Structure formats: C-alpha cells, structure tokens
A protein has these predicted regions:
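Active-site core segments that coordinate phosphate-bearing ligands/cofactors
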Residues: 1-169, 174-271
Length: 271
C-alpha cells in the first residue's frame, strides 16, 4: 500500500499507477467487482478499503535499453552525455508521432506477462514495410508498450465493470520526464492523470508517510484524513487529461498489439 499512500490514493474512487521497472495500478473500489478476473488481484488499502490491482512484470526496462543505445551513439560522436536531456528529447519527440504509432509495435517483455498469458518473454520491435518508421513513432511505440499490458487489464475495470474514479495519480520513473509519461498513460486508460512533485519517489516516500502517520498522528485521524490535512493539504499535483485523438490512437494500437501477440509467442518458442 505504499504507492497508494505516496499518491494520496486511499479513498474510494481514487487510484494510483506505479510505473518503473514493473508497473501496477490500484483502483480503490466503492463495491466489489461483479466476478473474479484472472488478471485482476483484489487487495486492500492500509485502512481496509477494497482495491482492484493490475500488476505487470514489465514497464520501462526495454524502453531504457533503447535510450541507452542512443546514449552510446552520442558517445560515439564525442558529444557529452546528459541522460536527463536524452530522455527529454526522445520522450518529447514521441509526442509528435502518429497517435497509433504509424503501425509500429513493441513488446517490452523482458520477462513473461500473466495478463497476456505469457510465462516467458522476449523484447521485440515489429514493423511491416508499409508502416511509418521514424524516430517519433519508434519512441512512441516503446512508450505505449510500457503501459500497454496495464491498459489491457484496466480496460476490464473501466469498460466492463464501469468503475468510476475521481482521480488517478502516477508515480515512478516513467513520469520523471515532465508531462510525457503522464500523457501516454492518460491516453491508455482514458482518464485524467495527476502527477505530484514527488512522482519519482514512489514506495520509499509512501513508507516514510506511513511511519509519520504512526508517530505524528496526535489527532487520531483516519489515514485518508491525515494525508489530506497534514501531508498533501490540497496538493493534487498537475493533471493532464487525455485527448480524443490520443485515446483513439492508443485503442487502435492496442488492437494491433493484441493481434500481434502470436509473434511474441513464437519468439519465446524459437529464441
């Protein structure tokens, strides 16, 4: 529950997404789901509310590997390397790409993904001769892939179970480059995403806040009230809403992604 605490997402109708080496979403529910789902785990907030959790084994590792390749190229040219600048340039150029990534596909499976039924994984980049292959689309497809499996799981919650949320907050390394990961995630789950200044801190920040709650809660407040009134004090972070174009593009991408999963299965079998 440290991610929930770090993002002030312990109340019903709130949620958080942690996106780093792996990723997960936690949506605090008002009521139980209509039925069990293999890809959705049921947990609780630290103070007992029901939470629907989608966990993905892979998120930014493959994306980071590609960024490191560009770092090596920059070093080859004898240009001083600033990793924050490289990430910023590559992530922001992705936002200029086609919303469906021009047909390009990426499977970021360093390991298997239970949500898509794969016990093992192979990182793959796939394109056809007629796809729009350029740097913007290349980076965009890898950003999409970082939250693609998360989208598949959350589509069940929002489209089939009709879950309603007032606020979803993102944290973790994907959000260090301002505005980009946030916009990609907003398109993926068709929901406004808030990111706080502490977005890159994740679970460690949540652990510290839980410790503070145990030690400094002189008013004997509930955890939610303590976070609202003593920690965040109205700070909901900076919110980015999805655009219809981004949502439609990501939906088209994820249909291609799901159709291409046999390619990933074949790679696992033969490589």
């Amino acid at each position: 529950g440290t991610g929930m605490v770090a993002t002030n997402a312990v109340k019903q109708r709130t949620g958080n997404v942690s996106a780093g080496t792996s990723s997960f979403s936690m949506i605090v529910l008002e009521k139980e789901l209509s039925k069990p789902y293999e890809m959705i785990d049921m947990v609780t907030t630290p103070d007992g509310s029901l939470v629907a959790m989608v966990h993905c084994n892979n998120c930014t590792s493959d994306l980071n590997a590609w960024v490191n390749l560009f770092k090596e190229y920059q070093e080859l040219l004898g240009i001083p390397v600033d990793m924050d600048e490289i990430y910023s340039k590559l992530y922001n150029i992705a936002l200029t790409g086609d919303t469906d990534c021009g047909g390009l596909l990426s499977y970021n499976y360093i390991s298997g993904e239970p949500v898509t039924g794969l016990a093992d994984g192979r990182p793959l980049f796939v394109r056809s001769a007629n796809d729009k292959f350029n740097l913007a689309n290349f980076m965009r497809t890898h950003l999409y892939a970082s939250v693609g499996v998360l989208k598949i799981g959350n589509d069940i919650l929002f489209n089939e179970e009709k879950i309603k949320v007032d606020r979803i907050t993102g944290h973790g390394g994907l959000f260090r480059t301002k505005g980009v990961g946030q916009r990609i995630l907003a398109a993926a789950i068709n929901s406004p995403i808030s990111v706080m200044e502490t977005a890159g801190e994740g679970g460690a920040w949540g652990i510290a806040l839980l410790g503070s709650y145990l030690v400094n809660n002189e008013k004997k407040q509930s955890l939610a009230d303590f976070l609202d009134e003593s920690v965040f004090v109205g700070d909901a972070g900076i919110e980015v809403s999805p655009t219809p174009e981004d949502v439609a593009g990501f939906n088209a991408y994820i249909e291609n992604y799901k159709a291409g999963l046999p390619i990933e299965e074949a790679a696992v079998k033969f490589k």
